[in-house]
Amino acid sequence: MSSKIGQQIMRFLLLCFIAFSVIAEDADPDVIYNYHKINDTLSTAGQLLPVHVAKLQRENFQLVINLAVADKARNLDESYTITHAGINYVQIPVVWDTPTLDDLDLFFSMMDARGERKTLVHCFANYRASAFTYLYRVLKEGVPEADARKDMMQIWSDDAFTKYPQWRAFIDKALVNGA
C-alpha cells in the first residue's frame, strides 16, 4: 500500500514540476507576478523568472533584494541569472511563518546601503517584500504611514492579514519597536 502512495506522490510531484516548467517557459517577459512600482527607484514584486531579467535590464534596475527562502523549484538559479546580467543581488531568507526583527534589520541595512540604486524587492508572492518595504518607508524614510500602507495594500488585503496573522503581529511589533 505504501508503495502505491509513494508512486502517486511521485507522479503528483512530477506533474507539478512539468506544470511549473511550462508556465515558466510561457511566461510573459514583461509581466512579473504582483509587480508594484512605488516610485522611480523602488518597486516590489513576486517571484522572478529567468525571462524577467531582460525587463530588469531594460528598466535599469541595479539591485534585486530577494526576501524568499531558497527553494530549488522556484529560485534555484536566480542569483546567478541576475548577477550574470550585471545586476547586484542580495538574498535575505525570511521564513514565512516566523519573520524576525533581525531579518528586518538586515533588510534596512541593505536598503540604506543601496543609495540611489534602482531597486526591486521581491519574494514569492510580494507579501514579504511589500511588508518589509512598507516598514522601511515608514520607519526609515519618514513616509506618512497612510501613503506607505496604500502601496502595501495593493498586494495585501484584510483577508490576507486574517489568514496570516503572524504578519500583522510582526508589522505591529516592528512599528512599536521602531524596528
Describe the residue ranges of each PLM region:
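N-terminal secretory signal peptides that target proteins for export/translocation
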Residues: M1-Q7
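N-terminal signal peptide c-region/cleavage motif recognized by signal peptidases
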Residues: A19-S21
